[in-house]
């Protein structure tokens, strides 16, 4: 099977403006442009984050990549969106505006799981909130149009990427149009998009309009209804469900065999030899590939999915099935009288291209305009290194696969070690501690399908669910070798691993677990079983507790061998689609049995394009073929049940006693109320001595109303009861790398230890 070819991103002839050289920081003001000798910018990037010149921040990576192509790039960071004035700060760009909300979806960044405004923003100086608008991509793009009518506007980033088709929006509780429609942009780039970005910039420099570029992978654009690239293209209609497939006509049972044969040979001269040609398998596959390359799938229109949950779920399933760059087809969705057209996903970057992108001349510091301001996101990642992209886990509550792809893109050892040396030599305040070597996951570095042909033809949503695919290479030796070489660098004293660990993969390599536990865990290691019960786990596409138990046994064994007292910190998610009240009760019993107490909890948050969000909105399961009679999914939407599910995770807290007590009685599980070992809660609220005396004397209790459950802003963190109060030695929590949204998670908070395994 032929691999789709892509032009290397470092092979283009540089634009003429490369003569200006490399800027110490990309300019944010006219004065900075004057210092560089620029009369104008070729491309201006507008972002909802402050500008930090580091590859973990999307605008810095994009800006430096375009600069390496020879373009003059300016940045407008966190502009005042109430008028177009701030968007004129750098003048009119010669080519186009590039618009992004920042490293996170602006709605997730600004609101909690209960739709309450957040009090801080990790991507803003001094964590000041309200520096970006709701749905920032749409607002910024419209202001760019207002500032300079007729200028080309390109949108991208995680917010645009996950809103590229009609999508359910949790914050307005309705299905919204593609962000292309609402933003009035010319073109949308989805995924990390370096390939598309570089090609578009060079074509724009030659005079081509953004709105005319309709043949670039990883893009979306608006076209008249029924538009086709050429006459060879064919449309596959997948806009409805429950329609029978092809039905062949029945043979006439009264027709004689000779008559059937004569009818089948009409027009054939029996006196002439007939050539029978048998196509080889390769020829048949080549023909099929050619047909797929010229096929577009029509998914249900916006107007249909906005009012029909089954069609919404069907559209979501179709999009996710068409996500492998090796076999994905184009998609089209009608919005009114126009179509939103999606080209197939981009070809993943090679190791050489990854090295090129991460080896660009980043200043690795915030822009000087911010002075000594405290920027939490920067403090969190300034001593960390991104070693890979992508995730083949397929967790339904997470959108990494939809954004970065399922194919792992890894950097070379040389590139990673060089960046560690750059941190050591150039980053102020470095004390020898690397806070993380990772990415979307900690341990998928250089893992891939054993057979490239199988990888290109695969249409599975996950390589590890329900079981690890037999074709998946799970060899962790490359990662072990990388860890050892990184530790050996002069000046490096400690390397922690804070990215999420796939423990179901790790147990395939006990040597890796030993290396991790003995050298890279600082007291606590965070992993995420997410749940203990099969019902919700099957909807999450997460492994069962057997893998957790095996990993726990190896973790504890190697910790003892190293003479270290270390703890696993399991994370769980409340109110995920497919979770019943009994499931949460059983999870609480598991926590009590294993002596865990959660000190912070978080409920599921539906984020655009996640499969779990589709379940939450439609009550259907898009992991299976959809029909009007397909299975319904139990969805926790009302406030009482969401509060109850959160309370089960903190069964030990006095504030949650009443709601759990009432629920257990209603569920017929009053046997779990008492002082015996198997009971979940005591018969009286913890700490209420008067109620305990009344209960002992046989007097009725004053049950009253329970206090409102608290809603902390960070992810769930379970502490072993024996370790409560123990101080972890690990680095700070999760990394805010570009594009890591997870439904059911608050955004990563500096110092908040929110990063964990998937």
Swiss-Prot record:
SMART domains hit by this protein: Elp3 (SM00729)
PANTHER family, A to Z: UPF0313 PROTEIN YGIQ
Gene3D superfamilies: tm_1862 like domain
Official protein name in the record: UPF0313 protein CV_1738
Ranges of residues in domain Radical SAM core: 377-642
Domain of life: Bacteria
Positions bound to [4Fe-4S] cluster: 391, 395, 398
Family, per entry: Belongs to the UPF0313 family.
Cofactor list: [4Fe-4S] cluster
Regions of compositional bias (Gly residues) in chain numbering: 727-737
Pfam families: DUF3362, Radical_SAM, Radical_SAM_N
NCBIfam families assigned to the protein according to its UniProt record, in alphabetical order: SAM_YgiQ
Native source species: Chromobacterium violaceum (strain ATCC 12472 / DSM 30191 / JCM 1249 / CCUG 213 / NBRC 12614 / NCIMB 9131 / NCTC 9757 / MK)
A single MF term (Gene Ontology): iron ion binding
Keywords: 4Fe-4S, Iron, Iron-sulfur, Metal-binding, S-adenosyl-L-methionine
Cofactor binding, note field: Binds 1 [4Fe-4S] cluster. The cluster is coordinated with 3 cysteines and an exchangeable S-adenosyl-L-methionine.
HAMAP family found in the cross-reference section: UPF0313
Disordered, as annotated region: 698-758
Lineage, uppermost ranks: Bacteria, Pseudomonadati, Pseudomonadota, Betaproteobacteria, Neisseriales
């Amino acid at each position: 099977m032929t691999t789709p070819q892509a032009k290397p991103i470092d092979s283009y002839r540089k634009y003429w403006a490369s003569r200006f050289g490399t800027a110490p920081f990309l300019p944010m003001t006219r004065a900075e442009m004057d210092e560089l000798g620029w009369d104008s910018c070729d491309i201006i990037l507008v972002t909802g984050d402050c500008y930090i010149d580091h590859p973990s921040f999307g605008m810095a990576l994009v800006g430096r990549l375009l600069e390496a192509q020879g373009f003059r790039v300016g940045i407008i960071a966190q502009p005042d969106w109430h008028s177009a004035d701030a968007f004129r700060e750098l003048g009119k760009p010669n080519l186009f505006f590039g618009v992004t909300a920042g490293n996170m979806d602006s709605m997730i960044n600004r609101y909690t799981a209960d739709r309450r405004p957040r009090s801080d923003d990790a991507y803003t100086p001094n964590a000041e909130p309200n520096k970006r608008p709701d749905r920032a991509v749409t607002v910024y793009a419209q202001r760019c149009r207002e500032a300079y009518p007729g200028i080309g506007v390109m949108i991208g980033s995680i917010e645009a990427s996950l809103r590229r088709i009609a999508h359910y929006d949790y914050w307005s509780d309705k299905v919204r149009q593609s962000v292309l429609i609402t933003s009035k942009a010319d073109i949308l780039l989805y995924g990390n998009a370096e390939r598309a970005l570089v090609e578009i910039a060079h074509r724009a420099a030659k005079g081509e309009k953004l709105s005319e570029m309709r043949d670039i992978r990883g893009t979306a654009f608006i076209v008249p209804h029924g538009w086709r690239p050429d006459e060879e293209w064919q449309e596959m209609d997948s806009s409805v469900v429950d329609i029978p497939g092809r039905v062949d006509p029945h043979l006439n049972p009264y027709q004689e065999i000779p008559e059937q044969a004569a009818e089948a040979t009409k027009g054939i001269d029996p006196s002439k030899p007939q050539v029978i040609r048998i196509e080889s398998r390769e020829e048949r596959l080549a023909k099929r590939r050619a047909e797929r390359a010229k096929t577009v799938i029509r998914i249900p229109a916006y107007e249909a999915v906005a009012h029909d949950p089954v069609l919404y779920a069907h559209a979501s399933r179709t999009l996710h099935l068409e996500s492998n760059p090796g076999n994905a087809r184009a998609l089209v969705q009608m919005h009114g009288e126009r179509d939103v057209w999606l080209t197939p996903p981009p070809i993943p970057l090679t190791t050489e291209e990854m090295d090129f992108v991460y080896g660009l001349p980043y200043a690795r510091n915030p822009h000087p305009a911010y002075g000594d301001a405290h920027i939490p996101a920067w403090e969190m990642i300034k001593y960390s290194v991104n070693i890979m992209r992508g995730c083949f886990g397929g967790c339904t509550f997470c959108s990494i696969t939809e954004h970065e792809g399922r194919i792992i893109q890894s950097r070379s050892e040389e590139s990673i070690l060089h960046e560690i040396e750059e941190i050591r030599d150039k980053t102020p305040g470095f004390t020898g501690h690397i806070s993380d070597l990772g990415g979307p996951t900690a341990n998928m570095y250089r893992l891939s399908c054993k057979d490239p042909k199988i990888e290109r033809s695969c249409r599975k949503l996950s390589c590890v669910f329900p079981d690890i695919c037999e074709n998946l290479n799970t060899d962790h030796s490359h990662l072990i070798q990388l860890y050892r070489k990184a530790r050996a660098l002069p000046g490096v004293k400690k390397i922690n691993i804070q990215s999420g660990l796939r423990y179901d993969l790790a147990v395939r390599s006990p040597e890796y677990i030993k290396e991790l536990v003995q050298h890279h865990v600082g007291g606590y290691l965070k992993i995420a079983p997410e749940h203990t019960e099969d019902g919700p786990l099957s909807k999450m596409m997460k492994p069962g507790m057997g893998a957790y138990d095996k990993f726990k046994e190896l973790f504890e064994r190697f910790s003892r061998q190293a003479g270290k007292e270390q703890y696993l910190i399991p994370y769980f998610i409340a109110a995920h689609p497919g979770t019943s009240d009994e499931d949460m009760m059983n999870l609480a019993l598991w926590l009590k049995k294993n002596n865990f107490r959660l000190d912070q909890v978080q409920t599921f948050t539906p984020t655009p394009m996640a499969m779990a969000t589709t379940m939450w909105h439609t009550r259907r399961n898009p992991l299976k073929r959809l029909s009007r009679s397909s299975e319904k999914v139990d969805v926790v939407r009302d406030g009482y049940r969401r509060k109850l599910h959160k309370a089960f995770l903190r069964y030990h807290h006095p504030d949650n006693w009443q709601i759990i007590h009432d629920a257990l009685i209603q569920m017929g599980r009053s046997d779990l109320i008492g002082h015996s070992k198997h009971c979940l809660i005591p018969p009286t609220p913890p700490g209420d001595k008067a109620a305990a005396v009344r209960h002992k004397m046989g007097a009725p209790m004053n049950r009253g109303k329970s206090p409102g459950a608290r809603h902390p802003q960070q992810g769930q963190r379970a502490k072993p009861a024996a370790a409560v109060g123990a101080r972890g030695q690990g680095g700070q929590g999760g990394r805010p790398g570009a594009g890591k949204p997870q439904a059911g998670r608050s955004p990563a908070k500096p110092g908040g230890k929110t990063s964990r395994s998937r």
